[in-house]
A protein has these predicted regions:
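Outer/extracellular conduits and scaffolds centered on Gram-negative outer-membrane beta-barrels
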Residues: 1-209
Length: 209
């Protein structure tokens, strides 16, 4: 019989691999299904840089996240490959949709509620309170405001402020993406990928809270 239900939240019609929820027989419902973030590429992830063609070559064993974050280069978002590497594949370390997994659970560990009713000199009042504890949500705002989806130059200030995100231009506006040493030094304290590397919404662990 059927053991897995593949579900789609349909919060947008252009989400990469839009089937973003799962339910399993004998398990809980509301499981968030997507990719696991692994930070971003740094200059150290690459074997070489060809200054003529301006292309980067990944080191052996480094995951190729190009299906999600464009051609690999420093600053682009990186994701974890969870499936076994196929040595017979032409690109054994490339990410595929099979590398998705359960990244969150929207079902609370427990929930409850209570109500109060009161009357006094002809006045009455009713109140009801409910609560849920220990559950995950997929924050779609984090997805849209840290990517280049729609090319609207959205900016999630706290996470991708200029002092946190990977930058390809210095403070004077000079392009540094093709100068490996300068690029690495300038971004040595970066904590976030360059948002222009992701062109479509992705269900990813970064957005699960």
């Amino acid at each position: 019989g059927e053991k897995e239900w593949i579900l789609t939240s349909a919060w947008r019609n252009d989400v990469v691999n839009s089937d973003d929820y799962r339910a399993y027989v004998g398990g809980t419902s509301g499981l968030i299904y997507g990719y696991v973030n692994d930070g971003f590429y740094t200059v150290a992830d690459f074997e070489s840089f060809d200054s003529k063609s301006r292309t980067w070559k990944l080191k052996e064993g480094v995951v190729d996240s190009s299906p999600l974050s464009d051609t690999p280069r420093p600053g682009n978002a990186k994701f974890k490959k969870l499936t076994p590497v196929d040595p017979n594949s032409t690109n054994p370390y490339q990410l595929t949709e099979a590398d998705r997994t359960v990244i969150g659970n929207t079902t609370p560990k427990f929930s409850g509620g209570f109500g109060l009713n009161a009357t006094y000199k002809g006045f009455d009042m009713s109140m009801f309170f409910n609560f849920m504890y220990d559950f995950d949500v997929l924050n779609a705002n984090k997805i849209m405001l840290t990517t280049w989806a729609d090319n609207k130059e959205n900016n999630f200030l706290m996470d991708i402020a200029s002092d946190k995100r990977w930058r390809n231009f210095d403070d004077m506006g000079n392009e540094i993406r093709y100068s490996p040493e300068v690029l690495a030094e300038f971004n040595k304290n970066a904590t976030m990928w360059n948002p222009t590397s992701i062109g479509r919404p992705i269900c990813m662990s970064y957005a699960v809270e």
